[in-house]
Amino acid sequence: MVEQRKYKKVYAIEPSSSAIEIAKKIYPDNKNVKYINGFAEEEISKLKLSKPIFFSTMCCLAHLEDEDVLGILKTIDKIAPVDSVLACSEPWGDFYHRECWNIRPPEWWSDTLADWEFEFYNDYILTDPPGRSKGFIAIKK
């Protein structure tokens, strides 16, 4: 994100200290990345934000249970200033749960973040399970 999108500051929250060390070795020159070792719902709540921010989950939330994702989303909602953006490569569609692969319908996301305006994309269709898509953004209103 720093190199391709020219972001001035990226907070990379990761529960695995080993993964952080690997990232630092792969990208040793990324001085604009602040690595934070911890769980998202705990570490996000410590951020002091005064202007809109861009959140990206990549596809991480699909690997977590609903209860954990709810905690993360509620934390984001609590600290995010109006006009903040949440960009997700998360799968969406009919509910589907198996070990480390969880798909939630658009209503689940929009009900959880009621003050956010969502746009779900259909340009990436999943084949496992079929009939689901991947990718959406939301803006806090």
Tell what function each PLM region has:
Residues 55-56:
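A conserved beta-strand element that flanks and buttresses the S-adenosyl-L-methionine
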Residues 51-52:
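Local beta-strand N-terminus motif with an aromatic residue
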Residues 60:
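Hydrophobic adenine-recognition pocket in adenosine-nucleotide-binding enzymes
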